[in-house]
Amino acid sequence: MIASIRGIIQSIGIDHLIVETGGVGLLIYAPRSTLNAVGQIGSETFLYTLLIVREDALTLYGFSDPAQRNLFEQLIGVSGVGPKIALNLLSSGSPDEIQKSIAGGDIARLARVPGIGKKTAERIVLELRGKIDLRQLSGTTPGNVSTLDRELTDILISLGYSATEAAAAIAALPGDAPPTLEERLRLALRYFGSA
C-alpha cells in the first residue's frame, strides 16, 4: 500500500493532480477540497493516499488528511458506491459534515451529490450510520456536549441503544430543539422510529 506521497505538483486537473516524486509522475485522483488546498504547480505537496488495485488498473487517490482517506475507505465499502461517487461526496463538504449527515440520516443532502440517488443515499446511511462515532468529530467533543445531552445519552444507552446510536440521535436533533430533557428525549426516540 502507498500510504502517502510527497512530491512536486506537475499539473492540477478537475478531479486529479500529477505529483512527481523520485522522477516518476503519479496521477492522483482527489476531492475538490484537496485539489484546492495542495498549492500551486511547481510547489511541494504532501498527500495521504490510497492505492486501489483492480484487474485492469492501479489507481491512486489522494487526500489532505487521514479523516478524508478513512471516510473514503468507508464509502467505497458501501455496495454501489465506487471511488468516483465517494470522491463526489467528499467534494461536497468536510468529512465532519458528511459524517454528521450520514449519522443524522440526511438522505436529501446526500442525494444532492452527483451520482448519488435516493436509494444509494439510503444505503450509505444504512451501512455507515452505526460506524460513525460523532464524539470523534470536531465540534462534538465531550467539552462541547451540554449536560442535557450527556443526560440524554445516558438515558438512551439505558434504553438499549449504543453510544454511537445515541450520539447520532442527538446530532439529528434540530438546532431549535426544546431545552427540556423530556422533549429532547421524545425527539430522539422519534429519530429511532424513523430510522
Swiss-Prot record:
Which InterPro entries does this entry report, sorted A to Z? Answer: DNA_helicase_Holl-junc_RuvA_I, Hlx-hairpin-Hlx_DNA-bd_motif, NA-bd_OB-fold, RuvA, RuvA_2-like, RuvA_C, RuvA_C_sf
Which parts of the sequence are annotated with region: Domain II?
Answer: 65-142
Q: For the region Domain I, what residue ranges are annotated?
A: 1-64
Q: From which domain of life does this come?
A: Bacteria
Principal localisation: cytoplasm
From the UniProt entry, list the residue stretches annotated as the region Domain III. 151-195
Q: Which SUPFAM superfamilies match?
A: DNA helicase RuvA subunit, C-terminal domain (SSF46929), Nucleic acid-binding proteins (SSF50249), RuvA domain 2-like (SSF47781)
**Keyword field contains Cytoplasm:** yes
The record's subcellular locations are:
Cytoplasm
A Gene Ontology biological process noted in the UniProt record is: DNA repair
Q: One GO molecular function term?
A: four-way junction DNA binding
Residue stretches spanning the membrane: none
Q: Where is this region: Flexible linker?
A: 143-151
Q: Which UniProt keywords apply?
A: Cytoplasm, DNA damage, DNA recombination, DNA repair, DNA-binding
GO terms for CC?
cytoplasm; Holliday junction helicase complex; Holliday junction resolvase complex
Q: Which family does it belong to?
A: Belongs to the RuvA family.
Known partners and oligomeric status = Homotetramer. Forms an RuvA(8)-RuvB(12)-Holliday junction (HJ) complex. HJ DNA is sandwiched between 2 RuvA tetramers; dsDNA enters through RuvA and exits via RuvB. An RuvB hexamer assembles on each DNA strand where it exits the tetramer. Each RuvB hexamer is contacted by two RuvA subunits (via domain III) on 2 adjacent RuvB subunits; this complex drives branch migration. In the full resolvosome a probable DNA-RuvA(4)-RuvB(12)-RuvC(2) complex forms which resolves the HJ.
Cited function: The RuvA-RuvB-RuvC complex processes Holliday junction (HJ) DNA during genetic recombination and DNA repair, while the RuvA-RuvB complex plays an important role in the rescue of blocked DNA replication forks via replication fork reversal (RFR). RuvA specifically binds to HJ cruciform DNA, conferring on it an open structure. The RuvB hexamer acts as an ATP-dependent pump, pulling dsDNA into and through the RuvAB complex. HJ branch migration allows RuvC to scan DNA until it finds its consensus sequence, where it cleaves and resolves the cruciform DNA.
- Entry text on domains: Has three domains with a flexible linker between the domains II and III and assumes an 'L' shape. Domain III is highly mobile and contacts RuvB.
HAMAP family reported for this sequence: DNA_HJ_migration_RuvA
Q: What is this protein called?
A: Holliday junction branch migration complex subunit RuvA
Q: Which organism is it from?
A: Chloroflexus aurantiacus (strain ATCC 29366 / DSM 635 / J-10-fl)
